[in-house]
UniProtKB/Swiss-Prot annotation:
This is Cystic fibrosis transmembrane conductance regulator. Keywords: ATP-binding, Cell membrane, Chloride, Chloride channel, Endoplasmic reticulum, Endosome, Glycoprotein, Ion channel, Ion transport, Isomerase, Lipoprotein, Membrane, Nucleotide-binding, Nucleus, Palmitate, Phosphoprotein, Repeat, Transmembrane, Transmembrane helix, Transport, Ubl conjugation. It comes from Rattus norvegicus (Rat). Residues 1466-1476 have a biased composition (Acidic residues). GO terms for molecular function: 14-3-3 protein binding; ABC-type transporter activity; ATP binding; ATP hydrolysis activity; ATPase-coupled transmembrane transporter activity; bicarbonate transmembrane transporter activity; chloride channel activity; chloride channel inhibitor activity. Its EC number is 5.6.1.6.
């Protein structure tokens, strides 16, 4: 970025904003890049401003018990704010003085006042000077206030971010990420745009007093009649505003419903296409859109009346002001025109400026209070460390994630003390639940010496991660002692990648040591992965490391922890996403050898790792089940150890199954604790009345607001083999979605009834721990792509201790002053739809011809405008050519037909004309505005429908290129613009344009010479606008792109908050945040400056125009005072309206860019059109000159497919047309009714093949089903032949019936029959409404297993003959897994089944096998052939998979399989029971 020329600019350059000319010139000629933008002035840097405000806020906190943020802001910015306010006031005062001079000029034409005729020219010069002074005062004042608002926003941005990095985990669990984003976006943006109008809270009243004083001098008491109308109008606007708030809340709920299901559909578009649900989803979303539009129209009509009231009030304000005075005294034309000018200014002050200023102050003060409350929230407490202590000691440690029991009792009592009942007694009431204190950790004792390794294992949710958080200081101990040095390194369970290069992620601000770095990279098996990248370890990773596999992210996260030289290393399940071989290599080379001299705490569930640990801690329900060595475990807990060691392949099980086994084993062998009581009754959905209460973790008080506290009711264990931790404790830091369950919502409010229909928010702590909400789906997505198997060979490291090379200090990375725009662009990449710098005429044409009525309404608007102009010219003609006969009262009539005095006797004639014209124009304006707003909203409806259809029918390659968030932005942000802003902005622009053009026409009609000055003025305006828009739209685009890194960095920091605190890298991340802020500031500041450059020059052009008009009017004296008054009044009206019209035109062009983006999505080519094109190409290649006649009988009968036979010939599959082939020239066949197992390593193409069957990808070759080729029928017909269970479970917001049958094809009896068949009937029956019960938030009230059963039921209902299953048992508990196997055997007995599974034992049910390796397919007719030593499968399977399959084959033949859960002890009905 270049240095800003503002700092060296002269006073004249700053006054006229000439320093922005180079950037405007470059933007007009070339496309602007980030490097072209000037740096923000040094006074606007985030470091400087945040330090300034932070210093004042600390001073405020130190000096007062109740600190006020507004006082800190006042001390920082008040004097400049006052200075620009005075400039703004002086500029506004000139508007009040202008009508006085206008009256004097008109009076100079009075035949009886010839003395002032000679000074008319001087009065004209004075009037023009007032316009010049106003222009020179107003624009610097507005820019200065915008500048101060920007600085306040930057300072508070930084203050909020710094506070966020200090928040305690308890606070993070109480606030949502949406609240933080709201603080940094919606609210704070009001400072930038609103501060310029804030001064009108005092300027407008002073302006009104001054104007009323001047009007009193003209009209006496009559002046207050017009003011009274304006006050009534303001009250009317306030009433409409209240009504709009009511509709806004209702409408917001409807919009939320639509966006929720739209988001769900976009995130699960693969499932939607696989189920052929495009039309069904389109109908559901459009029905919600219809309900939303009803509210939108009502709200728009109210906003229309509020906005148009300003325009419509002009006639009547003047009329009511003049009428009483005229009836009594008569009036001269000078007073009429002066009154009109005064009323224009008065109307703006009363109806626009003052209400807006009041609203701005109200919003700003409320927002400052919100930020103030946020800044006073609890911060996490840094533990007191002993730097000389290198081990770890914990003595009788107990901890709660929530506030302590006694502390909460005191809070509730305190709240009740403040609220008295009518008889003066205090009441503290509790629920009748059996409340038991539930600490997350209880009486933990540890003593680990330097160099020892502690392995922590235990049941799901037992507190393993919580123990690490306790050591880090994130969890505060309520009892006990913790001792360690404080030099800690941490690797989180969920891999966290910050935006930056691979090297920066590993070094993470620690001083670079090449030997240590290379050793760590080698030990973490990253060498081979890094060499595959073009930039190697300088490769820039995007948000969350989206370009990496899950395994690569896990290894980088581990390398970061290992690279840091610390005394204590906390490794929270670092191997969860790695295959067995890679895990073994990293554990040996890194944890056991490289870190041999360090104290390590490893969370793991593998027996081999437990054996090699110096000590073992087994946790169960927050308590220590066992602490000691592995040999002590065998002697002290023989039942437990022998049970686990009885599993020959325990370490080869998935992490989920190992956790399930541990949980079940601990549950069976744990010693009964007297302090823990359990209800052995089996849980059932029939206890719906207790459902909400059992999962609420609060004290219920009848008089106090409810607080979240650390006590819950113990609930019974479920029948399944996994832990019941979700019911036993309020918060599990283990991401439960990985264990096959979805946590229930945690609400801040306690309700007496069930919580089924309610939505939950995702807290920041949920975001950090990836607890299920919207994040659970992303976790499942992640796990589907993370099983990357490293092929790196074992590495023998040197015995030298890399940590002996201790550096002088762990300093942060040097961050240069220059911003690396390219790195930022790559790190914070966001899908931006490329659109032209200026909205093209084609976009306007497409938009206004979108709806037949819209073009007709525009023509109608023009006709109404012509009628209004004609009516105005007619009135002027009457007043000019038909003098009123005043007879009795001696109306003065000069020989040259001057109409000077209107008396009471002649008043009624003028009154009827004026009122008649006013009523006509008012009615016409209403008829013009309402149809326009109505049809524009209809156009928005059409655009939404077309865009939705286009997205739902777009090929999958489109969704691979575009992010889901970018697509959702079109349906949220852009559709909101089309609904809310564009209709009224277009109405305002058209109305203002007609006012300006109409005034110019009338002025030119009265004085033709003025028309000669109008033409060049309009031409210059049009050219200047086009010149400015080229640059301004590019700056707005850059500003929008620059805003994304700010919020991305906030979310990224929150996700890795525990990591960056453990590494003490808060300052480093604050610096990165300030970099992003400075980048955005540079773009936004340039936009503000160039906008002011443009508006000032527009004012200058029309100041010149007014000068010309004034002197032409004064010098051509033959027309008299009436004509001069009309010309000057209208010219002044042009000046006051023009700036508004210009802003509206710019806003319209800016908002039309949303229309351009929507059209881009509408123009996306659909799957059907692409397939039709491919089919034509295939036919033309086969017979280029032949006549192609479609055979309607290719689809042989309505029962197709009848058998399910599949034949694949020479199939080649690509993700993109010009990409590499994933599968190439593969051929095989599947007989009807066969069960085929699809095997291969991760990334070999198993899911790709299933997608090719569904025609989701670019395919060439032949696929036949029962003799019918894929290219002989439509996509929908082809896909309906398949029943699909995808990797990612899709439950959308809707009823059970809609989720099972969204097309409404089946009767209830058939749905119930299938539900019973798959084991869902007893589940659905427990919910209120049963099939009509509404599932929300991805069906969070259902377990993962039940969601999978829903997908199974859909396939059964589809009556398909070919079933495709892509890892259906992923993350399932053993019970649900057994149910799915049973349904597959029974419900799909006569179907062809293609099963892709990572659970090798699932393959025992298959009759044939297909193995994919290196893009080729090998067929095996039996399991024995598959396991043959000569089989190519030996090269495709990892050794762990071979062990599983071998064990499964022999155990199934020779002995009963080890029971993980008591499946045989449960009846068939119990299998179908649910645990939520």
């Amino acid at each position: 970025m270049q240095k800003s020329p503002l700092e060296k600019a002269s006073f004249i350059s700053k006054l006229f904003f000439s320093w922005t000319t180079p950037i405007l010139r470059k933007g007009y000629r070339h496309h602007l890049e980030l490097s072209d933008i000037y740096q923000a002035p040094s006074s606007d840097s985030a470091d400087h401003l945040s330090e300034k405000l932070e210093r004042e806020w600390d001073r405020e906190q130190a000096s007062k018990k109740k600190p006020q943020l507004i006082h800190a802001l006042r001390r920082c910015f008040v004097w400049r704010f006052v200075f620009y306010g005075v400039l703004l006031y002086l500029g506004e005062v000139t508007k009040a003085v202008q009508p006085v001079l206008l009256g004097r000029i008109i009076a100079s034409y009075d035949p009886d006042n010839t003395e002032e005729r000679s000074i008319a020219i001087y009065l004209g010069i004075g009037l023009c000077l007032l316009f010049i002074v106003r222009t020179l005062l107003l624009h610097p004042a507005i820019f200065g206030l915008h500048h101060i608002g920007m600085q306040m926003r930057i300072a508070m941005f930084s203050l909020i971010y710094k506070k966020t990095l200090k928040l305690s985990s308890r606070v993070l669990d109480k606030i949502s990420i949406g609240q933080l984003i709201s603080l940094l976006s919606n609210n704070l943006n009001k400072f930038d745009e609103g501060l310029a109008l804030a001064h009108f809270i005092w300027i407008a009243p002073l302006q009104v007093v001054l104007l009323m004083g001047l009007l009193w001098d003209l009209l006496q008491f009559s002046a207050f009649c017009g003011l009274g109308l304006l006050i009534v109008l303001v009250i009317f606007q306030a009433i409409l505003g209240k009504m709009m708030v009511k509709y806004r809340d209702k409408r917001a709920a409807k919009i939320n419903e639509r966006l929720v299901i739209t988001s769900e559909v976009i995130d699960n578009i693969y499932s939607v296409k696989a189920y052929c649900w495009e039309s069904a989803m389109e109908k559901i979303i459009e029905s919600l859109r219809e309900e939303e539009l009803k509210m939108t129209r009502r709200s728009a009509y109210m906003r229309f009346f509020t906005s148009s009231a300003f325009f419509f009030s002009g006639f009547f304000v003047v009329f009511l002001s003049v009428l009483p005075y005229t009836v009594i005294n008569g009036i001269v034309l000078r007073k009429i025109f002066t009154t009109i000018s005064f009323c224009i200014v008065l109307r703006m002050s009363v109806t626009r400026q003052f209400p807006t200023a009041v609203q701005i102050w109200y919003d700003s003060l409320g927002m400052i209070r919100k930020i103030q409350d946020f800044l006073q929230t609890q911060e996490y407490k840094v533990l007191e460390y002993n730097l000389m202590f290198t081990g770890l000691v914990m003595e009788n440690v107990t901890a709660f994630w929530e506030e302590g029991f006694q502390e909460l009792l005191e809070k509730v009592q305190l709240n009740n003390d403040d609220r008295k009942t009518s008889n003066g007694e205090n009441h503290l009431s509790f629920s009748h639940l059996c409340l038991v204190g539930n600490p997350v950790l209880k009486n933990i004792n540890l003593n680990i010496k330097k160099g020892e390794m502690l392995a922590i294992t235990g049941s799901t949710g037992a507190g393993k991660t919580s123990l690490l958080m306790l050591i880090l200081g994130e969890l505060e101990a309520s009892e006990g002692i913790i001792k360690h040095s404080g030099r800690v390194s941490f690797s989180s369970q969920i891999s966290w990648i910050m935006p930056g290069t691979i090297k920066e992620n590993i070094i993470f601000g620690v001083s670079y040591d090449e030997y240590r770095y290379k050793s760590v990279v080698k030990a973490c098996q990253l060498q081979e992965d890094i060499t595959k990248f073009a930039e190697q370890d300088n490769t820039v990773l995007g948000e969350g490391g989206v370009t990496l596999s899950g395994g690569q992210r896990a290894r980088i996260s581990l390398a970061r922890a290992v690279y840091k030289d610390a005394d204590l290393y906390l490794l929270d399940s670092p191997f969860g996403y790695l295959d067995v071989l890679t895990e073994e290599q990293i554990f040996e080379s890194c944890v056991c050898k490289l870190m041999a001299s360090k104290t390590r705490i490893l969370v793991t569930s593998k027996m081999e790792q437990l054996k090699k640990a110096d000590k073992i801690l087994i946790l169960h329900e927050g308590s220590s089940y066992f602490y000691g060595t592995f040999s002590e475990l065998q002697s002290l807990r023989p039942d437990f150890s022998s049970k686990l060691m009885g599993y020959d392949t325990f370490d080869q099980f998935t992490e989920e199954r190992r956790s399930s086994i541990l949980t079940e084993t601990l549950r069976r062998f744990s010693v009964d604790d007297a302090s823990t009581t359990w209800n052995k009754a089996k849980q059932s959905f029939r206890q719906t009345g207790e459902f909400g209460e059992k999962r609420k973790n609060s004290i219920l008080s009848s008089f106090s607001s409810v607080k979240k506290i650390s006590i819950v009711q113990k609930t019974p264990l479920s029948i399944e083999g996994e832990s019941d931790d979700l019911q036993e404790r309020r918060l599990s830091l283990v991401p439960d979605s990985e264990h096959g369950e979805a946590a229930l919502p945690r609400s801040n409010m306690i309700t007496a009834g069930p919580t089924f229909p309610g939505r939950r928010r995702q807290s920041v702590l949920d975001l950090m721990t990836f607890t299920p909400s919207s994040v659970s789906s992303s976790l499942q997505r992640t796990r589907a792509s993370i099983r990357k198997i490293s092929l790196a060979p074992r590495i023998s490291l040197k015995e030298e201790d890399i940590y002996s090379r201790r550096l002088s200090q762990d300093s942060t990375l040097n961050i240069t002053e220059e911003i690396n725009e390219e790195d930022l662009k790559e790190c914070f990449f966001d899908d931006m739809v490329k659109i032209p710098t200026v909205t093209t005429w084609n976009t306007y044409l497409r938009y206004f011809t979108l709806h037949r009525g819209l073009f007709a309404v525009l023509i109608w608007c023009v006709l109404v405008f012509l009628v209004e102009v004609a009516a105005s010219l007619f009135v002027l003609w009457l007043l000019k050519n038909n003098p009123v006969n005043g007879g009795n009262n001696g109306t003065k009539i000069a020989n040259t037909s001057y109409v000077v005095v209107i008396t009471s006797s002649s008043f009624y004639y003028i009154f009827y004309i004026y009122v008649g014209v006013a009523d006509t124009l008012l009615a016409l304006s209403l008829f013009r505005g309402l149809p326009l707003v109505h049809t524009l909203i209809t156009a928005s409806k059409i655009l939404h429908r077309k865009m939705l259809h286009s997205i739902l029918h777009a090929p999958m390659s489109t969704f691979n290129k575009l992010k889901a968030g970018g697509i959702l932005n079109r349906f949220s942000k852009d559709i909101a613009i089309l609904d809310d802003f564009l209709p009224l902005t277009i109405f305002d622009f058209i109305q203002l344009l007609f006012i300006v053009v109409g005034a110019i026409i009338v002025v030119s009609a009265l004085q033709p010479y003025i028309f000669l000055a109008t033409v060049p003025g309009l031409a210059v305006f049009i050219l200047l606008r086009a010149y400015f828009l080229h640059t301004s739209q590019q700056l707005k685009q850059l500003e929008s792109e620059g805003r994304s890194p700010i919020f991305t960095h906030l979310v990224t920091s929150l996700k890795g908050l525990w990591t960056l605190r453990a590494f003490r890298r808060q300052t480093y991340f604050e610096t990165l945040f300030h970099k992003a802020l400075n980048l955005h500031t540079a773009n936004w500041f340039m936009y503000l400056a160039t906008l002011r450059w443009f508006q000032m020059r527009i004012d200058m052009i029309f100041v010149l125009f007014f000068i010309v008009v004034t002197f032409i009017s004064i010098l051509t004296t033959g027309e008299g005072e009436g004509t001069t008054g009309i010309i000057l009044t209208l010219a002044m009206n042009i000046m006051s309206t023009l700036q508004w019209a210009v802003n509206s035109s710019i806003d319209t062009d800016s908002l039309m860019r949303s229309v351009s983006r929507v059209f881009k999505f509408i123009d996306i080519q659909t799957e059907e059109s692409i397939c039709t094109k491919i089919m034509k190409e295939l036919h033309s290649e086969d017979s280029p000159n032949a006549l192609v006649i479609k055979n309607e009988h290719v689809k042989k009968c309505d029962t197709w497919p009848s058998g399910g036979e599949m034949v694949v010939k020479d199939l080649t599959v690509k993700y993109v047309d010009d990409g590499n082939a994933i599968l190439e020239n593969i051929s095989f066949s599947i007989s009807p009714g066969q069960r085929v197992g699809l095997l291969g390593r991760t990334g070999s193409g198993k899911s790709t093949l299933l997608s090719a069957f569904l025609r989701m990808l670019n395919i060439k070759g032949e696929i036949q089903i029962d003799g019918v080729s894929w290219n002989s029928m439509t996509l929908q017909e082809w896909r309906k032949a398949f029943g699909v269970i995808t990797q990612k479970v899709f439950i959308f917001s809707g009823t059970f019936r809609q989720n099972l049958d969204p097309n409404g094809k089946w009767r209830d009896e058939e749905i119930w029959k299938v539900a019973d068949q798959v084991g869902l009937k007893s589940v659905i029956e427990q919910f209120p409404g049963q099939l009509n019960f509404t599932l929300v938030d991805g069906g969070y009230v259902l377990s993962h297993g039940h969601k999978q059963l829903m997908c199974l039921a859909r396939s059964v209902l589809s009556k398909a003959k070919i079933i495709l299953l892509d890892e259906p048992s992923a993350n399932l508990d053993p019970i649900t897994y057994q149910v799915i196997r049973r349904v597959l055997r029974q419900a799909f007995a006569g179907c062809t089944v293609v099963l892709c599974e990572h659970r090798i034992e699932a393959m025992l049910d298959c009759q044939r096998f297909l193995v994919i390796e290196q893009g080729n397919v090998w067929q095996y007719e039996s399991l024995q052939a598959l396991l043959s030593e000569k089989s190519v499968f030996q090269r495709a399977l990892s050794s762990s998979e071979k062990m599983k399959l071998f064990h499964g084959r022999h155990s199934s033949k020779q002995k009963p399989r080890t029971q993980i859960t008591a499946v045989k002890e449960e009846t068939e009905e119990e299998v179908q029971e649910t645990r939520l």
